[in-house]
Design a protein with these regions (language model features):
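Active-site helix of classical SDR
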Residues: 179, 215
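Conserved mid-core segment of classical short-chain dehydrogenase/reductases
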Residues: 150-165, 208-211
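N-terminal Rossmann NAD(P)H-binding glycine-rich loop of SDR-like oxidoreductase domains
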Residues: 83, 91
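Conserved glycine-rich Rossmann-like NAD(P)H-binding loop of the short-chain dehydrogenase/reductase
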Residues: 95-113
Length: 310
């Protein structure tokens, strides 16, 4: 969970990025489904005008101003986990907004069926794959660490250690290894940007998916650390936060989900607007405000949900 200063929600320094409008891309319109007992229980109450007014003053695309703009047009992007889900949509988003080249990385490049991309083999947990990718893709200017895994495991119980190790290897050590090898590549190409796909689970511990929360909290620390370490190299580091995204990874969850293209649009807009933190949906905005405003009350509600379902 992130360490936050003791301050009121109204004191946050947030602004909205200007969206890219080069091409009009339709977004999914989903009806609300019954909530499950994980992150869904902490979605903003859309039926409440009071909450809507409080959150409406700040866009669901909440971000924090930080660095220099990085242009998407004519960029050369590398996206991990690009064979499906959010990674695949990121590849399309880069191409549609004028990227000169997009490396679509996956464990099995044979699963990548997109025109206009350069498929490459990259298992983020394989050092040899990472080294080879860094050697081949020497022209990259934007790196998107998107590959991830979710096991939905409590911290204690059968299989929890295996789940924790798998999630840490993919969600933390994978991006760390990739950044370690690609930071010099980005610096040699003018600095560019690193985009880490995080989660609202980076900010708090939900006991029903605690091992995942631990891996995303570690990825949050990684993001903050490399942002400071690479700033003088001219490399922007952006963290992207969302609740459940409508992909295969969250197919088992019966709740309202965010369209992948919405996440991509807001991320690309943040690149061009000089932002270092992107809230990709309402749930990210809502949970961020609740955790910082009254963490004790937030965790009391989590405990209540946990006790009621056990």
């Amino acid at each position: 969970m992130q360490a936050y200063e003791e301050r009121g929600v109204a004191e946050t320094d947030m602004v909205r990025p200007r969206p890219l409008m080069r091409r009009s891309i339709p977004r999914d319109a989903r009806s609300l489904a019954p909530s499950d007992n994980r992150l869904a229980d902490f979605a903003p109450p859309h039926s409440s005008r009071e909450h809507g007014a409080k959150l409406g003053a700040r866009s669901t695309a909440v971000t924090r101003k930080a660095g220099h703009p990085v242009k998407v047009r004519n960029s050369i992007a590398l996206v991990t986990g690009a064979n499906r889900g959010l990674g695949r949509v990121f590849c399309h988003g880069f191409l549609q907004n004028g990227a000169a080249k997009v490396y679509a990385a996956a464990r099995d490049p044979g699963q990548i069926h997109m025109s206009g991309v350069v498929p490459i083999r990259l298992d983020v947990t394989s050092i040899s794959d990472v080294l080879e990718a860094a050697d081949v893709c020497r022209d990259v200017t934007i790196l998107v660490n998107n590959a991830g895994v979710l096991r939905d495991s409590a911290m204690l119980g059968e299989g929890s250690e295996e789940a924790a190790r798998q999630e840490m290897e993919t969600n933390f050590f994978g991006p760390l290894s990739i950044v370690q090898r690609f930071a010099p590549v980005l610096a040699a190409n003018g600095g560019g940007a690193i985009v880490n796909i995080l989660s609202v689970a980076s900010w708090f511990t939900n006991p029903s998916m605690a091992t995942y929360c631990a891996s995303k909290a570690a990825a949050q620390v990684l993001t903050d650390a490399i942002r400071m370490q690479l700033r003088n190299k001219g490399t922007r580091v952006i963290g992207v936060y969302a609740g459940y995204i409508d992909t295969d990874m969250a197919s088992h969850v019966n709740t309202r989900k965010t369209a992948p293209m919405q996440v991509v649009e807001r991320t690309l807009a943040a690149l061009e607007s000089g932002m270092d933190r992107v809230f990709a949906d309402d749930r990210a905005t809502y949970i961020d405000q609740r955790v910082r405003a009254d963490p004790e009350a937030f965790y009391a509600e989590l405990q209540k949900h946990w006790d009621a379902t056990r």
